[in-house]
């Protein structure tokens, strides 16, 4: 089994907004490595390999799966919603899943910071650079789990082992 590392799927413009110091190198000429879009329908091959189908969500629904110890949970990602935050416990750990619709990006974090459990929410009036807030301090947080405004400015949340994928995956 491969070891997963924290990651976020986003677009380049959003990444640069959050990390203006970034540099990218284009190593692909489009010939040797073709760019492929994510599938919008299930192939016959995928359907054959699925086994029994879990019908709680549509097969192509986006989810963010979280795994802590022996516990796992999938959080549905609604592409019609600009920003959302799931606050839950998985495997006895307080977690939050941040969703940012314009870039179809989700990430999961531990909500515990210095023995304090934070309660996050998607703030409709916060800027896109920091669309989430915690109720306890009113601090603003980025999609990458960094506090950029408020009493916790400069602090970072700890990433959780997870994956953004389609429900059937």
Segments predicted by a language model, with ranges:
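Mid-to-C-terminal functional-domain signal that highlights helix-capping/loop sites
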Residues: 1-169
């Amino acid at each position: 089994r491969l070891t997963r590392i924290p990651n976020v799927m986003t677009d380049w413009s959003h990444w640069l907004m959050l990390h203006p110091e970034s540099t990218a190198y284009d190593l692909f000429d489009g010939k040797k490595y073709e760019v492929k879009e994510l599938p919008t329908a299930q192939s016959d091959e995928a359907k054959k390999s699925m086994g029994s189908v879990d019908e709680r969500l549509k097969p192509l629904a986006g989810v963010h799966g979280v795994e802590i110890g022996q516990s796992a949970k999938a959080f549905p990602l609604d592409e019609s919603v600009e920003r959302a935050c799931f606050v839950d416990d998985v495997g006895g750990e307080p977690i939050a899943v941040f969703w940012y619709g314009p870039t179809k990006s989700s990430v999961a974090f531990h909500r515990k910071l210095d023995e304090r459990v934070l309660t996050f929410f998607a703030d409709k009036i916060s800027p896109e650079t920091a669309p989430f807030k915690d109720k306890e301090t009113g601090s603003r947080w980025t999609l990458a789990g960094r506090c950029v405004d408020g009493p916790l400015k400069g602090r970072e949340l700890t990433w959780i082992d997870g994956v953004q994928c389609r429900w059937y995956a």
